[in-house]
Structures are given as C-alpha cells and as structure tokens.
Amino acid sequence: MKQKCVLIITDGIGYNKNSKFNAFEAAKKPSYEKLFKEVPNSLLKTSGLAVGLPEGQMGNSEVGHMCIGSGRIIYQNLVRINKAIENKELEKNENLKKLLAKCKRVHIIGLYSDGGVHSMDTHFKAMLEICAKNGNEVFAHAITDGRDVSPKSGLNFIKDLKEFCENLGVHFATLCGRFYAMDRDKRWDRVKEYYECLLGKAYKVPNLLEYLQKSYDENVTDEFIKAAQNENYKGMREEDGIIFINFRNDRMKQLVEVLNSKDFKEFEREKIFENLLTMSVYDDKFKLPVLFEKEKIENTLAQVISKAGLSQLHTAETEKYAHVTFFFNGGKEELLENETRVLIPSPKVKTYDEKPQMSAFEVCDAVKKGIEKGEDFIVVNFANGDMVGHTGDFNATIKAVEAVDTCLGEILECAKKHDYAFIITSDHGNCEAMQDEKGNLLTNHTTFDVFVFVQARGVSKIKDNMGLSNIAASVLKILDLEIPKEMNEALF
C-alpha cells in the first residue's frame, strides 16, 4: 500500500440531503461528480461527542483540525468548562481567586452567544456571577456574534445579558461586533476601535440594547456592530482586572496583545494592563495566568511522520493557516523536523463574498509544487466553503464551491501523475444550508455529516460510522507507518 499522501480539507462543505438553499448542490462541480462515481467515499461525523463537544453542538475548524491531526477525540474546552461550572470547580480556580483578591474592579470580555465555537453565553454569565458574589465591582463587555449564530440573534442575547447584569448589580459597559473586537488578520484599525471603547472613548449611548436595535434599523447586523459604551461607563483603569471568557484563542490574541504587550508598535496606546486572566492558553508568548491549561497531546500525525524522517508540507491561506499548523499539530506552534509551512495571504476584502475564490488558486499551486517536489505528506485547507458561507451570500458561496472544485481537479490530476494517494474531507459543514425554512439567513456551521473520499492502493471500501478522528491512522496506513496506540482506527 505504501504511497505518498495528500490530505485535502475542504472547510465548511457538508452533506445535506435537502437541496434547497444548498450552495454545494447548486454549484457546478465536475471534480466532485467524478469523485462520487470513481472513488471510495462515505460520510463522517463532525459534531457533538464525535469531536469532543457536547451532544448536538456543531463542530468548528479548531476542534475539527485538532481531531483530524491528533487521530483521537479530545474533550474540548467547552465540555471541560461546562463541567467546572456544574461542579463549582471554576469558582475555586486559584488563578481566578488571586485576580479577584488583587483587583477591586473586574472587566469580563467575550463573545456573547450560544454558538459554542469561541465562547458560550453560559460561561460569561457564570463568570459575572462568581465575580459579583465575591464582592468585586464588575463590568460586562459583550461582543456580538452574528456569524456562528444567526445575524440578528444578538438582540435576544443582549436583552438576556442586560437583565442578568441588572439582577446581579453588574455594569453593562460596552457593546461591539466581533468584526472589530475579534479580528485575527492584523487589521489593527478594527481592534483599535474596540480598545478605545474599553478605555471609555467610544460612542456613548444611554441604552446599549436600543443602540443594537437602531443598528439593525440601519442594516448593520451583529457581526458588524460599531463599538459603543454605556454613557455611565468611564473606562478601564490600569489597576483593574480583565478576564477573557473566550475559550478559543485565535480571535482573542490580537486584543490581548493590544491590552498587555509592552512591545506593541501598531498604534499608540494610552494605557496597558497587567492584570489579565484568559480562559485558555491564547499564545505561549503571553506569560499570563489561565483558567484552563491546555492538555498535552503527544504522538500526533505530524509528530509520527516527522519522527519517521519523512517530509511534510502544511499549507493554507491566512484565515485557516492556524488550523493546518497549530491546531492540526495538537496545539503546538513549533515547526517539526522536515515540516514545511506555506502561508498564502488571504485577500484584503471586507467580507469574502466580494472575492469568493479567496486565495484558493494560489493555495492549489502550493500543493502542486509540494507534490512535484516529492513531499511525503501534504495537508491543505481550502477556506472558501466556510468563509464565504459565513457571509450568507448564496450566489457568492456557489462560486466559492466552484473554485474549490476547480482546485480539486488540478490537485487530483497532479496526484495521479506522481502516484500520490489522497484523502478529501471537511472539518465541518456550512455552505450546504444557507437559509432555514422561513427564509432566514444561516451563516453558522451545521451539524451535518461531511464527505470523505479515499483514493489509495488497495482501498475499495470505507468502514461505516467513522469520524474525523479516524483520518490520521488512515494517512499513516497509506504511508506504511506504525499507528500509535493513542489514535483511533483507520477508515479502511
């Protein structure tokens, strides 16, 4: 069976038997049609307990790539935090107790929705309650979502938060869309707007809930809400404590850097803050206390390949680069021996419906070069189905799928020419359900299964009831390497 192998992750493309508002079904996709006819294929589970999330919880890119790259189900921070709240362990956390003892005033910052991708509203409320009951003066800073949940669901979430704050005696201080507060692509002008809001220098309003409704009236949805503050909020003081409740790291790193880093040079800052506490490890370079330390994941797919002396290439465009490197490698930043990484910049557009092909063709070229060079293993992510799917633009998402299909055709032709095996799958769904029955836009991930295709010598059938955690062992089997005991079985 021994063959070199390409693993292609088509982000956000899932299987939905309903063809209505299904951008995958609506797209012209000759490469996929060929795959369905000629290559062994099946469906994989990408949500809930199959990827270490609560039952019924949609999967996401971080969880999906970690599951694929580690070859096992890792119980995610969302599940760990839920358990810590249920059994009252969170309030006993030593780092939390230290911060609350040191700082009279405490600010809670995070994405406020039940999307479960970056955060959970229940975690936000639990933290507000712990801090308020401890006697601290508490300020809530809600970031509106509209991406992992529907675009105007924020009104109900923020109404809920406002009432919760009033009942607890907590200040509801600021409101801002994730487009600004949670940028991850070094668009510092966006983060600066939110930083200034936290300092009390933003647009002042008497009622943040009414401000949100007014934004809707002006066709601005949750993701894009401009930073605003309650008129009574006077801003953060340098001695205040700041707690970040997002458990996913990639969209909080820039904000933490702005608030805390002494070496930050992107724009002038009036204040920097020392008393920060993050829900999880956002970046090893931040020497900050955390509530939930990361679990050590050993014997990942990338590690096994590296230890065997084989070469590997990891490539994606900016939006998904962290997923094929940090998350795929089990939450480790360091480059492994014989590992090459190729980052393709994502296009500089406001939203990706403006350029649905994104940088897919450049990513495709990087893969073909890797095959021609003879890399033993290549992992690539095509971001289009997910990132354009998040915009809610159906026609643009059809074009996104068609761009991915074109790239698949080119890669598979190149793979065949150089005798490479390939596995194609997705980390989760998105573009296959763009509206609900009532015609409301769906911009979030789905809980649908995803396709998997395996073309390798000796493989004629894929086992039933498999998941993302079965892919790593499959790659090792193709490469003829020993499968570590920590990994789940192969797909075939």
UniProtKB/Swiss-Prot annotation:
Mn(2+) 2 binds at residues 11, 61, 427-428. The active site is at residue 61. This is 2,3-bisphosphoglycerate-independent phosphoglycerate mutase. Catalyzes the interconversion of 2-phosphoglycerate and 3-phosphoglycerate. Pathway: Carbohydrate degradation; glycolysis; pyruvate from D-glyceraldehyde 3-phosphate: step 3/5. Its cofactor is Mn(2+). Substrate binds at residues 118, 147-148, 178, 184, 248-251, 320. GO terms for cellular component: cytosol. It comes from Campylobacter jejuni subsp. jejuni serotype O:2 (strain ATCC 700819 / NCTC 11168). GO terms for biological process: glucose catabolic process; glycolytic process. Belongs to the BPG-independent phosphoglycerate mutase family. Binds 2 manganese ions per subunit. It is an enzyme of class 5 (isomerase). Mn(2+) 1 binds at residues 386, 390, 445. It catalyses: (2R)-2-phosphoglycerate = (2R)-3-phosphoglycerate. One of its GO terms (molecular function) is manganese ion binding. The gene is gpmI. Keywords: Glycolysis, Isomerase, Manganese, Metal-binding. InterPro entries: Alkaline_phosphatase_core_sf (IPR017850), BPG-indep_PGM_N (IPR011258), Metalloenzyme (IPR006124), PGAM_B_sf (IPR036646), Pgm_bpd_ind (IPR005995). The keyword Isomerase applies. Monomer. Its EC number is 5.4.2.12. Pfam families: iPGM_N, Metalloenzyme. SUPFAM superfamilies: 2,3-Bisphosphoglycerate-independent phosphoglycerate mutase, substrate-binding domain (SSF64158), Alkaline phosphatase-like (SSF53649).
